[in-house]
Design a protein with these regions (language model features):
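Short, solvent-exposed amphipathic alpha-helical segments in soluble enzyme
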Residues: 19-24, 76-78, 99-100
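A short, flexible N-terminal coil/short beta segment enriched in small residues
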Residues: 1-24
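Short glycine-/acidic-enriched loop or helix-start segments at secondary-structure transitions
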Residues: 15, 70-72, 94
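Cofactor-binding loop segments of dinucleotide-utilizing enzymes, especially the Rossmann-like FAD-
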Residues: 8, 39, 87
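Metallocofactor- and cofactor-centric catalytic cores in central/energy metabolism, strongly enriched
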Residues: 40, 45-46, 62-68, 84
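N-terminal beta-loop-helix "entrance" segment that forms/cooperates
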Residues: 29-56
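Ser/Thr/Gly-rich flexible loops in soluble cytosolic domains mediating phosphotransfer, phosphorylation
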Residues: 4, 78-105
Length: 105
C-alpha cells in the first residue's frame, strides 16, 4: 500500500516531527510505502505533490493547524480515502491510526 501524509502542529516544532517518525515507523512495520511531508518550523519539507497524492492509496493528515496546499487532498477526501487526525494521536498510538486508515480501503 502507498500512503502520503502531512504532519503539522501548532508550534511546528516537536509534534510535527514526532508524528512523522511515528508514521514512518508504523508504515515500515506493516510493509507500506509512505511519504510524509512536514509543515513545521523549518517550512515545508519533503513536499508531497499532486502526482504523489493521486498515486497513493490513501492520505493521512496529522494536523492541528491549517496547512499549505490542502486542496491537493480534495479528491481523496471526496472518495473517502483521507484520514484526518491530531498529531498527538499519531504519536500516542500509531497502530490504531493505521488500523483506522486501513478501514478506508
Amino acid at each position: 500500500m502507498k500512503i502520503v501524509a502531512v504532519t503539522a502542529c501548532i508550534t511546528g516544532i516537536a509534534h510535527t516531527y514526532m508524528a512523522q517518525a511515528a508514521l514512518e515507523k508504523e508504515s515500515k512495520k506493516r510493509g507500506y510505502e509512505i511519504q510524509v511531508e512536514t509543515q513545521g518550523g523549518m517550512g515545508v519539507e519533503n513536499e508531497v505533490d499532486q502526482d504523489d497524492v493521486d498515486a497513493a492509496d490513501l492520505a493521512i493528515l496529522a494536523i492541528a493547524v491549517g496547512i499549505e496546499g490542502e486542496e491537493r487532498f480534495d479528491e481523496k477526501r471526496e472518495s473517502g480515502k483521507l484520514l484526518e487526525v491530531d498529531p498527538s494521536d499519531v504519536i500516542k498510538n500509531p497502530s490504531a491510526i493505521f488500523d483506522e486508515a486501513e478501514k478506508l480501503l
